[in-house]
UniProtKB/Swiss-Prot annotation:
Family as reported in the entry's similarity comment: Belongs to the Fe(2+)-trafficking protein family.
Keyword Iron tagged: yes
GO biological process, any: cellular response to oxidative stress
A GO cellular component entry from the record: cytosol
Record-linked InterPro entries: Fe_traffick_prot_YggX, Fe_traffick_prot_YggX_sf
Protein name (record): Probable Fe(2+)-trafficking protein
Gene3D superfamilies: Fe(II) trafficking protein YggX
GO molecular function, one term: iron ion binding
Keywords associated with the record: Iron
Biological role: Could be a mediator in iron transactions between iron acquisition and iron-requiring processes, such as synthesis and/or repair of Fe-S clusters in biosynthetic enzymes.
């Protein structure tokens, strides 16, 4: 049976992650509070941030920026959007 969590992003109970996605306390917090669906949405957002901001993940500042954005996305006021981003029309 799937592990269920009260997802902090979706605001409802949903299937939880299979394992902590990051090491340390942040990984544990994400594992306990974020659903698979919300994690997939974060991965899409993270990819957009990496591509649009041309982040080099070999640079520790880029990794720190993404970690801060992850914390904002799930536990804060929301992550940044790339400059000039226009959401696609549905």
């Amino acid at each position: 049976m799937a592990r269920m969590v009260q997802c902090i992003k979706l605001g409802r109970e949903a299937e939880g992650l299979d394992f902590p996605p990051l090491p340390g306390e942040l990984g544990k917090k994400v594992y306990e509070n974020v659903s698979k669906e919300a994690w997939q949405a974060w991965l899409r957002h993270q990819t957009m941030l990496i591509n649009e901001n041309r982040l080099n993940l070999a640079d520790s500042r880029a990794r720190q920026y993404l970690t801060q954005q992850l914390q904002n996305y799930f536990f804060g006021t929301g992550a940044d959007m790339p400059a000039g981003f226009v959401p696609p029309s549905v």
